[in-house]
Protein backbone atom coordinates (compact mmCIF):
# COMPACT_ATOMS: atom_id res chain seq x y z
CA UNK A 1 0.00 0.00 0.00
CA UNK A 2 1.34 3.42 -0.92
CA UNK A 3 2.36 5.66 2.01
CA UNK A 4 0.00 8.55 2.63
CA UNK A 5 2.75 11.12 2.09
CA UNK A 6 3.69 9.76 -1.34
CA UNK A 7 2.98 12.34 -4.09
CA UNK A 8 0.13 11.57 -6.44
CA UNK A 9 1.34 9.88 -9.63
CA UNK A 10 4.59 8.62 -8.08
CA UNK A 11 5.72 5.32 -6.65
CA UNK A 12 7.26 5.53 -3.16
CA UNK A 13 10.94 5.36 -2.27
CA UNK A 14 11.91 2.72 -1.36
CA UNK A 15 9.61 0.77 -3.64
CA UNK A 16 8.46 -2.87 -3.60
CA UNK A 17 7.77 -4.51 -6.94
CA UNK A 18 6.54 -7.96 -7.91
CA UNK A 19 8.25 -8.94 -11.17
CA UNK A 20 6.51 -11.53 -13.36
CA UNK A 21 8.93 -12.86 -15.97
CA UNK A 22 8.45 -15.34 -18.79
CA UNK A 23 11.82 -17.10 -19.22
CA UNK A 24 10.75 -18.56 -22.57
CA UNK A 25 9.55 -15.31 -24.11
CA UNK A 26 11.15 -13.93 -27.27
CA UNK A 27 14.62 -15.38 -27.77
CA UNK A 28 14.53 -17.07 -24.36
CA UNK A 29 17.00 -14.61 -22.81
CA UNK A 30 14.65 -12.64 -20.54
CA UNK A 31 15.95 -14.07 -17.25
CA UNK A 32 19.58 -13.50 -18.20
CA UNK A 33 18.79 -9.93 -19.27
CA UNK A 34 16.93 -9.28 -16.04
CA UNK A 35 19.90 -10.36 -13.94
CA UNK A 36 22.50 -8.52 -16.01
CA UNK A 37 20.64 -5.35 -17.08
CA UNK A 38 17.57 -4.77 -14.94
CA UNK A 39 18.56 -5.95 -11.47
CA UNK A 40 21.59 -3.64 -11.01
CA UNK A 41 19.52 -0.58 -11.93
CA UNK A 42 16.69 -1.52 -9.57
CA UNK A 43 19.05 -2.11 -6.67
CA UNK A 44 20.77 1.22 -7.22
CA UNK A 45 17.38 2.99 -7.27
CA UNK A 46 16.19 1.30 -4.03
CA UNK A 47 13.55 -0.75 -5.81
CA UNK A 48 13.21 -4.04 -3.95
CA UNK A 49 11.57 -6.87 -5.85
CA UNK A 50 10.40 -10.45 -5.81
CA UNK A 51 10.96 -12.34 -9.05
CA UNK A 52 8.36 -14.91 -10.12
CA UNK A 53 8.87 -16.99 -13.28
CA UNK A 54 5.85 -18.03 -15.29
CA UNK A 55 5.72 -21.70 -16.29
CA UNK A 56 2.85 -21.94 -18.77
CA UNK A 57 0.22 -19.96 -20.61
CA UNK A 58 -2.13 -18.08 -18.25
CA UNK A 59 0.17 -18.72 -15.26
CA UNK A 60 0.60 -14.97 -14.72
CA UNK A 61 -3.17 -14.60 -14.82
CA UNK A 62 -3.51 -17.21 -12.07
CA UNK A 63 -0.75 -15.63 -9.99
CA UNK A 64 -2.24 -12.13 -9.92
CA UNK A 65 -5.70 -13.55 -9.21
CA UNK A 66 -4.37 -15.10 -5.99
CA UNK A 67 -1.65 -12.62 -4.99
CA UNK A 68 -1.93 -10.37 -1.92
CA UNK A 69 -1.49 -7.11 -3.81
CA UNK A 70 -1.06 -5.04 -0.66
CA UNK A 71 2.50 -6.38 -0.38
CA UNK A 72 3.53 -4.54 -3.54
CA UNK A 73 3.69 -0.97 -4.78
CA UNK A 74 3.68 -2.08 -8.42
CA UNK A 75 3.60 -5.11 -10.70
CA UNK A 76 6.31 -5.33 -13.36
CA UNK A 77 5.88 -7.62 -16.35
CA UNK A 78 9.00 -8.73 -18.23
CA UNK A 79 7.99 -10.50 -21.40
CA UNK A 80 6.02 -9.52 -24.48
CA UNK A 81 2.65 -7.80 -24.67
CA UNK A 82 0.83 -11.09 -24.14
CA UNK A 83 1.96 -11.41 -20.52
CA UNK A 84 0.69 -7.91 -19.70
CA UNK A 85 -2.61 -9.00 -21.26
CA UNK A 86 -2.71 -11.96 -18.87
CA UNK A 87 -1.92 -9.78 -15.86
CA UNK A 88 -4.59 -7.17 -16.60
CA UNK A 89 -7.25 -9.80 -17.24
CA UNK A 90 -6.23 -11.60 -14.06
CA UNK A 91 -6.65 -8.37 -12.08
CA UNK A 92 -10.09 -7.84 -13.62
CA UNK A 93 -11.17 -11.36 -12.63
CA UNK A 94 -10.55 -10.75 -8.93
CA UNK A 95 -13.48 -10.10 -6.57
CA UNK A 96 -11.78 -6.79 -5.70
CA UNK A 97 -11.18 -5.90 -9.36
CA UNK A 98 -12.07 -2.22 -8.90
CA UNK A 99 -9.17 -1.67 -6.53
CA UNK A 100 -6.90 -4.34 -8.05
CA UNK A 101 -6.82 -2.67 -11.47
CA UNK A 102 -5.47 0.49 -9.80
CA UNK A 103 -2.24 -1.29 -8.87
CA UNK A 104 0.49 0.40 -10.96
CA UNK A 105 1.89 -1.70 -13.80
CA UNK A 106 5.27 -1.60 -15.50
CA UNK A 107 6.21 -3.05 -18.90
CA UNK A 108 9.77 -4.39 -19.23
CA UNK A 109 10.28 -5.67 -22.79
CA UNK A 110 11.48 -9.26 -22.85
CA UNK A 111 9.34 -10.97 -25.47
CA UNK A 112 9.00 -10.96 -29.23
CA UNK A 113 6.19 -8.38 -29.20
CA UNK A 114 6.96 -5.26 -27.16
CA UNK A 115 4.64 -2.62 -28.60
CA UNK A 116 3.42 -1.37 -25.22
CA UNK A 117 6.97 -0.80 -23.99
CA UNK A 118 7.81 0.98 -27.26
CA UNK A 119 4.80 3.27 -26.80
CA UNK A 120 5.75 4.12 -23.21
CA UNK A 121 9.30 4.80 -24.38
CA UNK A 122 7.87 7.20 -26.97
CA UNK A 123 5.68 9.00 -24.41
CA UNK A 124 8.79 9.53 -22.27
CA UNK A 125 10.37 11.48 -25.13
CA UNK A 126 12.99 8.89 -26.07
CA UNK A 127 13.92 8.06 -29.63
CA UNK A 128 12.72 4.78 -31.10
CA UNK A 129 15.00 1.96 -29.94
CA UNK A 130 14.80 -1.82 -29.69
CA UNK A 131 16.14 -4.81 -27.77
CA UNK A 132 18.40 -4.06 -24.78
CA UNK A 133 18.28 -0.29 -25.32
CA UNK A 134 14.50 -0.36 -24.97
CA UNK A 135 14.75 -2.60 -21.90
CA UNK A 136 17.17 -0.20 -20.21
CA UNK A 137 14.97 2.80 -21.01
CA UNK A 138 11.90 1.09 -19.53
CA UNK A 139 13.84 0.00 -16.45
CA UNK A 140 14.95 3.58 -15.91
CA UNK A 141 11.31 4.68 -16.13
CA UNK A 142 10.56 2.31 -13.25
CA UNK A 143 13.52 3.71 -11.32
CA UNK A 144 12.16 7.24 -11.84
CA UNK A 145 8.79 6.07 -10.42
CA UNK A 146 6.51 8.35 -12.44
CA UNK A 147 3.02 7.09 -13.26
CA UNK A 148 0.43 7.96 -15.88
CA UNK A 149 -3.20 6.83 -16.19
CA UNK A 150 -3.92 4.79 -19.32
CA UNK A 151 -7.01 3.78 -21.27
CA UNK A 152 -8.46 0.26 -21.11
CA UNK A 153 -10.49 -1.51 -23.81
CA UNK A 154 -13.27 -3.90 -22.79
CA UNK A 155 -14.32 -6.53 -25.34
CA UNK A 156 -17.47 -8.64 -25.62
CA UNK A 157 -17.86 -11.56 -28.04
CA UNK A 158 -20.85 -13.36 -29.54
CA UNK A 159 -20.09 -16.46 -27.45
CA UNK A 160 -20.42 -14.40 -24.26
CA UNK A 161 -16.74 -13.97 -23.51
CA UNK A 162 -15.63 -10.76 -21.79
CA UNK A 163 -12.00 -9.68 -21.79
CA UNK A 164 -9.80 -6.60 -21.65
CA UNK A 165 -7.08 -5.16 -23.84
CA UNK A 166 -4.28 -2.76 -22.98
CA UNK A 167 -2.89 -2.45 -26.50
CA UNK A 168 -4.82 -3.61 -29.56
CA UNK A 169 -7.31 -5.80 -31.34
CA UNK A 170 -6.57 -6.84 -34.92
CA UNK A 171 -8.35 -8.87 -37.58
CA UNK A 172 -7.05 -9.88 -40.96
CA UNK A 173 -3.49 -9.27 -42.09
CA UNK A 174 -1.99 -8.22 -38.74
CA UNK A 175 -3.66 -11.02 -36.77
CA UNK A 176 -2.54 -13.59 -39.34
CA UNK A 177 1.05 -12.37 -39.06
CA UNK A 178 0.81 -12.75 -35.27
CA UNK A 179 -0.38 -16.34 -35.70
CA UNK A 180 1.83 -17.47 -38.55
CA UNK A 181 5.05 -15.91 -37.19
CA UNK A 182 4.84 -17.94 -33.97
CA UNK A 183 7.11 -20.54 -35.58
CA UNK A 184 9.81 -17.83 -35.83
CA UNK A 185 9.56 -16.74 -32.18
CA UNK A 186 13.24 -17.53 -31.59
CA UNK A 187 14.09 -14.67 -33.98
CA UNK A 188 12.61 -12.10 -31.59
CA UNK A 189 10.73 -9.15 -33.07
CA UNK A 190 12.13 -9.80 -36.55
CA UNK A 191 9.58 -12.64 -36.67
CA UNK A 192 6.94 -10.04 -37.57
CA UNK A 193 8.95 -8.80 -40.56
CA UNK A 194 9.37 -12.37 -41.79
CA UNK A 195 5.67 -13.10 -41.23
CA UNK A 196 4.65 -9.91 -43.03
CA UNK A 197 6.46 -10.83 -46.23
CA UNK A 198 5.12 -14.39 -46.17
CA UNK A 199 1.57 -13.06 -45.80
CA UNK A 200 2.11 -10.49 -48.58
CA UNK A 201 2.99 -13.34 -50.90
CA UNK A 202 -0.48 -14.82 -50.35
CA UNK A 203 -2.73 -11.86 -49.64
CA UNK A 204 -6.18 -12.64 -48.22
CA UNK A 205 -9.44 -10.72 -48.20
CA UNK A 206 -11.66 -10.79 -45.09
CA UNK A 207 -15.38 -10.19 -45.28
CA UNK A 208 -17.37 -8.64 -42.48
CA UNK A 209 -19.36 -5.69 -41.18
CA UNK A 210 -17.51 -2.91 -39.35
CA UNK A 211 -19.26 -0.17 -37.37
CA UNK A 212 -17.90 2.41 -34.96
CA UNK A 213 -18.79 5.36 -32.77
CA UNK A 214 -16.55 8.29 -33.73
CA UNK A 215 -15.35 10.70 -31.10
CA UNK A 216 -17.57 13.54 -32.33
CA UNK A 217 -20.77 11.53 -31.76
CA UNK A 218 -19.89 10.06 -28.38
CA UNK A 219 -22.20 12.35 -26.40
CA UNK A 220 -25.15 9.96 -26.83
CA UNK A 221 -24.80 7.18 -24.28
CA UNK A 222 -26.75 3.97 -23.75
CA UNK A 223 -28.11 3.17 -20.28
CA UNK A 224 -25.48 1.13 -18.47
CA UNK A 225 -28.00 -1.61 -17.69
CA UNK A 226 -28.43 -2.42 -21.39
CA UNK A 227 -25.28 -4.57 -21.35
CA UNK A 228 -25.02 -6.26 -17.99
CA UNK A 229 -21.62 -7.59 -16.99
CA UNK A 230 -18.99 -7.58 -14.31
CA UNK A 231 -16.51 -4.77 -14.80
CA UNK A 232 -16.72 -1.16 -15.93
CA UNK A 233 -20.01 0.03 -17.41
CA UNK A 234 -20.20 -0.07 -21.21
CA UNK A 235 -22.21 3.07 -21.80
CA UNK A 236 -21.91 3.05 -25.61
CA UNK A 237 -22.72 -0.60 -26.36
CA UNK A 238 -25.95 -2.52 -26.92
CA UNK A 239 -26.13 -6.35 -26.98
CA UNK A 240 -24.52 -7.90 -30.06
CA UNK A 241 -27.81 -9.41 -31.23
CA UNK A 242 -29.24 -5.87 -31.60
CA UNK A 243 -28.35 -3.43 -34.41
CA UNK A 244 -25.86 -0.72 -33.55
CA UNK A 245 -27.47 2.58 -32.47
CA UNK A 246 -28.42 4.95 -35.33
CA UNK A 247 -25.76 7.54 -34.44
CA UNK A 248 -22.99 5.00 -35.10
CA UNK A 249 -21.15 4.91 -38.45
CA UNK A 250 -21.48 1.69 -40.47
CA UNK A 251 -18.67 1.20 -43.00
CA UNK A 252 -20.32 0.50 -46.39
CA UNK A 253 -17.50 -1.74 -47.63
CA UNK A 254 -17.43 -5.30 -46.31
CA UNK A 255 -14.16 -6.55 -47.86
CA UNK A 256 -11.03 -5.76 -45.86
CA UNK A 257 -7.33 -6.55 -45.80
CA UNK A 258 -7.09 -5.63 -42.14
CA UNK A 259 -8.89 -3.96 -39.25
CA UNK A 260 -6.90 -2.63 -36.29
CA UNK A 261 -8.04 -1.00 -33.05
CA UNK A 262 -5.05 0.53 -31.25
CA UNK A 263 -4.83 2.17 -27.83
CA UNK A 264 -1.21 3.31 -28.16
CA UNK A 265 1.25 4.58 -30.75
CA UNK A 266 3.20 1.43 -31.60
CA UNK A 267 2.19 -1.92 -33.09
CA UNK A 268 5.70 -3.28 -32.46
CA UNK A 269 9.01 -1.71 -31.49
CA UNK A 270 9.61 -0.82 -35.14
CA UNK A 271 6.02 -0.18 -36.22
CA UNK A 272 5.04 3.42 -35.37
CA UNK A 273 1.44 2.76 -36.35
CA UNK A 274 -0.22 5.84 -34.80
CA UNK A 275 2.03 8.83 -35.55
CA UNK A 276 -0.84 11.15 -34.64
CA UNK A 277 0.34 10.55 -31.07
CA UNK A 278 -0.92 9.35 -27.75
CA UNK A 279 -4.67 8.85 -27.50
CA UNK A 280 -6.66 11.30 -25.45
CA UNK A 281 -8.47 9.94 -22.42
CA UNK A 282 -11.31 7.80 -23.74
CA UNK A 283 -10.15 7.67 -27.38
CA UNK A 284 -8.62 4.87 -29.46
CA UNK A 285 -7.30 4.65 -33.01
CA UNK A 286 -9.29 2.64 -35.57
CA UNK A 287 -7.45 1.75 -38.79
CA UNK A 288 -8.74 -0.33 -41.65
CA UNK A 289 -7.49 -1.14 -45.13
CA UNK A 290 -10.11 -1.90 -47.76
CA UNK A 291 -9.76 -4.67 -50.32
CA UNK A 292 -8.29 -3.59 -53.65
CA UNK A 293 -4.99 -2.29 -52.32
CA UNK A 294 -2.00 -3.64 -54.22
CA UNK A 295 0.81 -5.66 -52.70
CA UNK A 296 3.24 -2.94 -53.75
CA UNK A 297 1.27 -0.31 -51.83
CA UNK A 298 1.09 -2.57 -48.75
CA UNK A 299 4.87 -2.95 -48.84
CA UNK A 300 5.24 0.83 -49.05
CA UNK A 301 2.82 1.30 -46.15
CA UNK A 302 4.59 -1.16 -43.86
CA UNK A 303 8.04 0.22 -44.70
CA UNK A 304 6.84 3.78 -44.09
CA UNK A 305 5.22 2.70 -40.80
CA UNK A 306 8.66 2.06 -39.34
CA UNK A 307 9.11 5.85 -39.23
CA UNK A 308 5.45 6.72 -38.74
CA UNK A 309 5.20 8.10 -42.29
CA UNK A 310 2.54 5.76 -43.72
CA UNK A 311 -0.27 8.30 -43.39
CA UNK A 312 1.78 10.68 -45.57
CA UNK A 313 1.34 8.30 -48.52
CA UNK A 314 -2.35 9.30 -48.76
CA UNK A 315 -3.32 5.74 -49.63
CA UNK A 316 -7.05 5.80 -50.55
CA UNK A 317 -7.52 2.29 -49.14
CA UNK A 318 -6.18 3.17 -45.67
CA UNK A 319 -8.63 4.82 -43.26
CA UNK A 320 -7.96 6.16 -39.75
CA UNK A 321 -10.73 7.28 -37.38
CA UNK A 322 -10.53 8.25 -33.68
CA UNK A 323 -13.30 6.27 -31.97
CA UNK A 324 -14.69 5.41 -28.54
CA UNK A 325 -16.41 2.13 -29.48
CA UNK A 326 -16.63 -0.34 -32.36
CA UNK A 327 -18.33 -3.53 -33.55
CA UNK A 328 -16.84 -6.06 -35.98
CA UNK A 329 -18.89 -8.97 -37.34
CA UNK A 330 -16.94 -11.38 -39.58
CA UNK A 331 -19.07 -12.99 -42.27
CA UNK A 332 -17.43 -16.37 -41.64
CA UNK A 333 -14.85 -17.89 -39.31
CA UNK A 334 -11.93 -17.46 -41.67
CA UNK A 335 -8.92 -16.01 -39.92
CA UNK A 336 -8.42 -15.09 -36.28
CA UNK A 337 -8.46 -12.11 -33.96
CA UNK A 338 -5.34 -11.01 -32.12
CA UNK A 339 -5.83 -9.20 -28.80
CA UNK A 340 -2.60 -7.75 -27.41
CA UNK A 341 -0.80 -10.35 -29.52
CA UNK A 342 -2.85 -13.22 -28.06
CA UNK A 343 -5.05 -15.19 -30.45
CA UNK A 344 -8.85 -15.20 -30.11
CA UNK A 345 -11.42 -17.20 -32.07
CA UNK A 346 -13.01 -15.42 -35.02
CA UNK A 347 -16.53 -14.31 -34.04
CA UNK A 348 -18.53 -11.11 -33.70
CA UNK A 349 -16.93 -8.75 -31.19
CA UNK A 350 -17.54 -5.25 -29.91
CA UNK A 351 -15.75 -3.02 -27.45
CA UNK A 352 -15.46 0.39 -25.92
CA UNK A 353 -12.63 2.33 -24.37
CA UNK A 354 -12.60 3.23 -20.68
CA UNK A 355 -10.63 6.42 -20.05
CA UNK A 356 -7.79 6.68 -17.56
CA UNK A 357 -8.65 3.29 -16.10
CA UNK A 358 -5.27 1.98 -14.97
CA UNK A 359 -1.89 3.30 -13.87
CA UNK A 360 1.33 2.53 -15.72
CA UNK A 361 4.95 3.46 -15.13
CA UNK A 362 5.64 6.11 -17.75
CA UNK A 363 7.92 9.03 -18.41
CA UNK A 364 5.41 11.61 -17.27
CA UNK A 365 2.85 11.89 -14.49
CA UNK A 366 0.56 13.90 -16.80
CA UNK A 367 -2.61 12.17 -17.92
CA UNK A 368 -3.82 12.29 -21.53
CA UNK A 369 -5.96 15.33 -22.15
CA UNK A 370 -9.65 14.61 -21.83
CA UNK A 371 -12.48 15.32 -24.22
CA UNK A 372 -15.17 15.95 -21.64
CA UNK A 373 -16.19 15.35 -18.06
CA UNK A 374 -17.64 11.91 -18.84
CA UNK A 375 -14.28 10.16 -18.56
CA UNK A 376 -13.38 8.29 -15.39
CA UNK A 377 -10.82 10.34 -13.43
CA UNK A 378 -7.65 8.53 -12.43
CA UNK A 379 -7.70 7.32 -8.83
CA UNK A 380 -6.53 9.82 -6.25
CA UNK A 381 -3.60 7.56 -5.46
CA UNK A 382 -2.42 4.33 -7.02
CA UNK A 383 -2.63 1.55 -4.47
From Swiss-Prot:
The modification Phosphoserine is found at residue 225. It is found in: Cytoplasm; Nucleus; Cell membrane; Endosome membrane. Its EC number is 2.7.1.91, 2.3.1.-. Acetyltransferase activity increases in presence of the kinase substrate, sphingosine. In Purkinje cells, kinase activity on sphingosine increases in presence of VEGFA. In neurons, kinase activity increases during the first 24h in presence of Amyloid-beta protein 42 to decrease after 96h. It comes from the Eukaryota. Residues 372-383 have a biased composition (Basic and acidic residues). The keyword Nucleotide-binding applies. Keywords: ATP-binding, Calmodulin-binding, Cell membrane, Coated pit, Cytoplasm, Endosome, Kinase, Lipid metabolism, Membrane, Nucleotide-binding, Nucleus, Phosphoprotein, Synapse, Transferase. It is a peripheral membrane protein. Interacts with ACY1. Binds to calmodulin. Interacts with SPHKAP. Interacts with CIB1, the interaction occurs in a calcium-dependent manner. Interacts with TRAF2. Interacts with EEF1A1; the interaction enhances SPHK1 kinase activity. Catalyzes the phosphorylation of sphingosine to form sphingosine 1-phosphate (SPP), a lipid mediator with both intra- and extracellular functions. Also acts on D-erythro-sphingosine and to a lesser extent sphinganine, but not other lipids, such as D,L-threo-dihydrosphingosine, N,N-dimethylsphingosine, diacylglycerol, ceramide, or phosphatidylinositol. In contrast to proapoptotic SPHK2, has a negative effect on intracellular ceramide levels, enhances cell growth and inhibits apoptosis. Involved in the regulation of inflammatory response and neuroinflammation. Has serine acetyltransferase activity on PTGS2/COX2 in an acetyl-CoA dependent manner. The acetyltransferase activity increases in presence of the kinase substrate, sphingosine. During neuroinflammation, through PTGS2 acetylation, promotes neuronal secretion of specialized preresolving mediators (SPMs), especially 15-R-lipoxin A4, which results in an increase of phagocytic microglia. This is Sphingosine kinase 1. It comes from Rattus norvegicus.
Amino acid sequence: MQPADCPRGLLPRPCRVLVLLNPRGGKGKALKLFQSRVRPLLEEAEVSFKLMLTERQNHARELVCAEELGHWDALAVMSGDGLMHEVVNGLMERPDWESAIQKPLCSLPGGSGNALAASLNYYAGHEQVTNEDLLINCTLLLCCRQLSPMNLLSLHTASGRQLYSVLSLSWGFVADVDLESEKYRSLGEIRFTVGTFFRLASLRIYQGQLAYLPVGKAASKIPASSLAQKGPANTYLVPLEEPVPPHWTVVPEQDFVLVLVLLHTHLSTEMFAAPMGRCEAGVMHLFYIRAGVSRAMLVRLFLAMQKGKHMDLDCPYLVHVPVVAFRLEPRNQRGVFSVDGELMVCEAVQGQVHPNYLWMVSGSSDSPSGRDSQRRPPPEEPI
